Amino acid sequence: MSINNETLRNSINDVEAGYEYMLAYAAQGLIDEPTSGGSGPSLRVYLERMQNGLLSIADDFETVIKDATGDNAELYLNYLSVLKEDAAKSKKAVDLVMSLPSIGSQVIDNLNASIHLRALLTDIFLIDEALTSLSRHQ
């Protein structure tokens, strides 16, 4: 993440860290969610952080876009509507998984494969890179 905005960076990190943790969790082949043990945060902690990031990421990007793009703001804001939809859809998927009494690896593997979550990550990378490119030429 190259944009220098701590709030946005935190939202992006929450989403990306959740995704990365889910990849490792899915690979474990767990039928049920561990109830104790282990070192570090649990899956649910990562998913809760991810939920928070998904709630705020579009608004956080909007703030940065309005500050950074000037006359091109409309183009970025138009694309931001796509990111907002993907974030909302991804959050609904995470909410569904969080509602389960126990979360197994297969459910997380399916969440990882969600086209909405993958689209959101691509949206984030595209807007970030576009803003970074723009800042180099201003």
Which residues make up each language-model segment?
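Short, well-ordered alpha-helical segments
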Residues: 82-92
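N-terminal intrinsically disordered, cationic/polar leader segments
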Residues: 1-80
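Amphipathic alpha-helical binding modules
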Residues: 90-137
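Short, charged/polar micro-motifs that form catalytic or ligand-binding hotspots
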Residues: 5, 40, 73, 77-83, ...
